[in-house]
Amino acid sequence: MPSIEGEYILKFRDDQGIFSTGETSIILDAPDLIDSQQIFVDREDTDPTAFGGAKSNVTISGGALQLSNPAANLTGTYTFADILDLGAVFSLNVKRLIQAVGFTVGAANTIDGLIPAGTFWDDYAQNGNFDGPEINDVSALIAVRSTVSPPSNGSSYTDSDFSGKTFNTFANGTFKGRGFQFRLTLTSESTAHNISIQQLGVTANFESRTERSYVSGGSTSTAPLTSSSSASGLNVTFGKPFFVGTSNLGGANAFLPSVGITIIGAAAGDYFVLSNISATGFNIKILDSSNNPVNPAKQFTFQAVGYGKGV
C-alpha cells in the first residue's frame, strides 16, 4: 500500500484474475515526524478550465474525466495542464490525489433507474450493492517525469523539454529535477466498464533540514570559520542551497532559512550582524562593543534551518 493516509478496502486476486469473495479494511494513519513546507498544490478538476490538459482516448462527462469509449480503447491518458518548475534542481516530495469511481457503460445512474419496475425497497439490492454490481477491473494511475535542464525557451517548460524522459508511476515519492510533468493513465479490463475521475491533482513539499557545512575551496567543511576584519564582513556559502520560493511558488524568498551563530571565545560586548541571507548563503560581521570588526578575528560556527536540498 502507498504511504498515504486513509482507509483502504483490500481484496485478493489470484493468478487467474479471480477476486476473493470478501474484503478487508485497513486504516493508515501516517506519522508526522519531520516538518515540511508545501510549495505546490495542483487540482486539475478545479482549474479555471477543468481538465484542460492534453487528452488521448479520454473525455470530460458531467464534470469528470473518463475513457472516451472502452469498446474502442481500454486505456487512455491525460497529461496535466500544469508543469512544475522549481527554478533549480532539488529533490522533491510529491503526493497524488485521485477520487474516482467505476461504473457500467450505459447503466442507469439514479436510484429510480436502477430499481427494476415492480420491485419493492425491501427486495432491492439484498446483496448490499445499491448502485449495481461491484466493479473491480478499472484503475487510475498518476506518473511523473522530470528534467534537470532549464526550459529550452528560457521562460516556461513545454512537452518537448521532456522528450526522452520516462514517466514513473507513483502514489507518493521523492524525485530529483527542476521541471516535473504529470500524467494520468485510465485503464479498464472490460468493454462494459468505465472509470470516472472526479478529483485529480498532486501536492509537493520540501522537508525541513539543517545545514552546518559551507563551501571552502572546492570542497565542503563543518570546521569553525574565522570572521573577517573587513568592514564588509565575511560571505558564507552553504554546502547545499535551500529552496526559498519563486514568483510562482509561494513568492520569491518566501522561505528563507533561519541562521543561528555561535561565536567561539566571545568577549564582553561582542555581537554579530547577519545580512544578505539567501538560498545559497549569508554575510556575517562580528563586531566588538565599539561596533568595529573584532580584532583579532573570532572563530564561529553556524546552523541554518530551511527547506529543500539543492543538487
Predicted regions and their residues:
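Surface-exposed coil/turn segments at beta-strand junctions on protein surfaces, enriched
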Residues: 1-5, 85-87, 173-177, 229, ...
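Hydrophobic beta-strand positions in extracellular immunoglobulin-like domains
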Residues: 12, 96-98, 288, 306
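A generic structural motif
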Residues: 13, 145-147, 262-264, 307
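Short, solvent-exposed secondary-structure boundary motifs
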Residues: 42-51, 259-269
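Beta-strand signatures of extracellular beta-sandwich domains
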Residues: 141-145, 260, 301-303
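Extracellular receptor-binding modules and their adjoining Ser/Thr/Gly/Asp/Asn-rich linkers
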Residues: 201-256, 263-311
